[in-house]
From Swiss-Prot:
Known catalytic reactions: adenosine 5'-phosphosulfate + ATP = 3'-phosphoadenylyl sulfate + ADP + H(+)
Catalytic-site annotation from UniProt: S84
Stated name of the protein: Probable adenylyl-sulfate kinase
Gene: cysC
Xref: NCBIfam families: apsK (TIGR00455)
Gene Ontology terms describing biological process: hydrogen sulfide biosynthetic process; sulfate assimilation via adenylyl sulfate reduction; sulfate assimilation, phosphoadenylyl sulfate reduction by phosphoadenylyl-sulfate reductase (thioredoxin)
Record-linked CDD domains: APSK
This protein's UniProt keywords: ATP-binding, Kinase, Nucleotide-binding, Phosphoprotein, Transferase
Length: 174
């Protein structure tokens, strides 16, 4: 089987990691080789002091793109869970990787604030951090993702099934 990349984009707390884990489980149960490339995990493991400037985010995204490209080229389904706030970098990922599907993981701001798994929204509301993507920082919503899921209205299972159906429609899965 040829590999491909499922690129999960969306603001913090939208449900990207939850969907990535659910998708990986379902795809592995179907017999596929799958790797999750989680933006937070990669950042903490490889370069914890990188920072969050636009340049640092772009460098981080380019590294993840390269990793996904290598996995895809070697017959693995790469599931990328990464905010990737800039349209231009997501377009670059699509061009570089080739076999690629963009999944916009959406949840309304009030839902993300309630979830707040990393405590980032609480810090932003208190004024302790600035530029939080999807709060007071830039997030350029995808215009034509292959799939859009609203994690406030769908279960992770429903989201994963929708993504798998689309991957089949695109010919990435039989």
């Amino acid at each position: 089987m040829e590999g491909f990349t499922i690129w999960l984009t969306g603001p913090s707390g939208a449900g990207k990691t939850t969907l990535a884990v659910k998708l990986a489980k379902k795809l592995r149960e179907m017999g596929y080789k799958v790797e999750i490339l989680d933006g937070d995990t990669i950042r903490k493991t490889l370069y914890p002091n990188l920072g969050f400037s636009k340049e640092a985010r772009e460098m981080h995204n380019r590294i993840v793109i390269y990793m996904a490209k290598l996995l895809t080229r070697n017959g693995v389904i790469a599931i990328v869970s990464l905010i990737s706030p800039y349209k231009r970098i997501r377009e670059y990922a699509r061009k570089e990787i080739g076999r690629f599907m963009e999944v916009y993981v959406y949840a309304p701001l009030e839902v993300r604030i309630k979830r707040d798994p990393k405590g980032l929204y609480a810090k932003a509301i208190r004024g302790e951090i600035r530029g939080l993507t999807g709060y007071d920082g830039v997030y350029e919503e995808p215009e034509n993702p292959e799939v859009k899921v609203d994690s406030s209205r769908m279960t992770p299972d429903e989201e994963a099934e929708l993504v798998i159906r689309k991957a089949k429609e695109l010919g990435y899965l039989p």
